[in-house]
Amino acid sequence: MQNIPPQVQAMLGQLESYQQQLQLVIQQKQKVQADLNEAKKALEEIEALPDDAQVYKTVGTLIVKTTKEKALQELKEKVETLEVRLNALNRQEQKINEKVKELTQKIQAALRPPTAG
């Protein structure tokens, strides 16, 4: 087996780093997506309640009473924040994927035997 040039070893190390970053971003995306789905479901449930319904929310380890209007406002803000975060993570994932693809091509080109011309 031939030795891998130091330059290619460095690129392989960078590729591994990108792949770890990608895994982290994917995990974060899954968490944000789950939180977003939960917030949207809660929003639907509260919107379906009558205006005079008693609404409670959790604050740390406590459950406190709030108004439907205030709960709706807080949930809408939460959904908006989570959507922004999810979009940012999608862009980050796309950029890392592009870097992985580009670096993989460079590694393959560096390891390809020279062609006789």
UniProtKB/Swiss-Prot annotation:
Self-association state and partner proteins as the record states: Heterohexamer of two alpha and four beta subunits.
Keywords: Chaperone, Cytoplasm
Compartments, record wording: Cytoplasm
GO MF annotations, alphabetized: protein folding chaperone; unfolded protein binding
Pfam family, one: Prefoldin_2
Family: Belongs to the prefoldin subunit beta family.
UniProt cross-references to SUPFAM superfamilies, sorted A to Z: Prefoldin (SSF46579)
Listed Gene3D superfamilies: 1.10.287.370
InterPro entries registered for this protein in UniProt: PFD_beta-like (IPR002777), PfdB (IPR012713), Prefoldin (IPR009053)
Organism encoding this protein: Pyrococcus abyssi (strain GE5 / Orsay)
Protein's UniProt keywords contain Transmembrane helix: no
Function: Molecular chaperone capable of stabilizing a range of proteins. Seems to fulfill an ATP-independent, HSP70-like function in archaeal de novo protein folding.
Stated name of the protein: Prefoldin subunit beta
GO CC annotations, alphabetized: cytoplasm; prefoldin complex
Top-level division of the source organism's lineage: Archaea
